[in-house]
Structures are given as structure tokens and as C-alpha cells.
Amino acid sequence: MVMTDPIADMLTRIRNANIVRHEVVEVPSSNVKKSIANILVQEGYVKDIEEYADGAVPMIRLSLKYNGKERIITGLKRISKPGLRVYCKKDNIPKVLNGLGVAIISTSKGIVTDREARKLGLGGEVICYVW
């Protein structure tokens, strides 16, 4: 079966595993997914990531983070979809929950957070919001 939106699949797997409080979640690997996972680690939403090969399919294992019984990730939302791409200019970069969350943006310099995009003065495609 052909997957039309692998990034949405990754976010949904993380969201579902987080809701039922799984310690780890595994997703098929790609360069974009690795970049998103690295941002989640860098921003403190995920403990760490591990790359491995499950047969011929490279995978990413994300260790989810919890604060006691509370989830660190309270929400994940895919913004730009294959059927409706959402772009922002450097002056219109969105803030998630007035800066408490993170917008992940694909720019010409790679995949960065909203704060990094503002600092670099870059716009791009808004991939998702995490809070």
C-alpha cells in the first residue's frame, strides 16, 4: 500500500503511543523524519532517537518522555498536507501557544524550528506544530 503522507503517519504514531504511554515508538526512516525527530529531541519533547535497520527497512526508534504520569507532548498537529501546502514568509512565522510550543518549518537551510527560522530570517513550509 502506498503511503501518501509519511510525515503525518510519523506524527500519528507518536501521538497514539504518547496517549497510551508507550516508552518507545518506531517509525520508518527518511531524512525529513530524522530532522523532525532531531528537533523533537533538541526541544525536549523526546528523550533520544536511535536508528536501526529492520531487515531492508531503516527505522527510527524514538524514546518518549514523561513527567511522572503527565505527558510532555500534549499535542501534535500536521499543518502543511500533500493536498494543501501551507507556506509562511519570514515576517509571518507562526507562534505556537504564544511561544510555549514549537512550529517545525522546512526552509532552504533545512528543517528548523520557528525560533531558528526567525533568527535566520527565513520562511518556508510549515510542517507541523508541537506543544
UniProtKB/Swiss-Prot annotation:
InterPro entries: Ribosomal_uS8 (IPR000630), Ribosomal_uS8_CS (IPR047863), Ribosomal_uS8_sf (IPR035987). The keyword Transcription does not apply. GO terms for molecular function: rRNA binding; structural constituent of ribosome. It holds the Pfam family Ribosomal_S8. GO terms for cellular component: ribonucleoprotein complex; ribosome. The keyword Magnesium does not apply. GO terms for biological process: translation. It comes from the Bacteria. Belongs to the universal ribosomal protein uS8 family. One of the primary rRNA binding proteins, it binds directly to 16S rRNA central domain where it helps coordinate assembly of the platform of the 30S subunit. PANTHER family: 40S RIBOSOMAL PROTEIN S15A. This is Small ribosomal subunit protein uS8. It comes from Clostridium novyi (strain NT). The lineage of its organism: Bacteria, Bacillati, Bacillota, Clostridia, Eubacteriales.
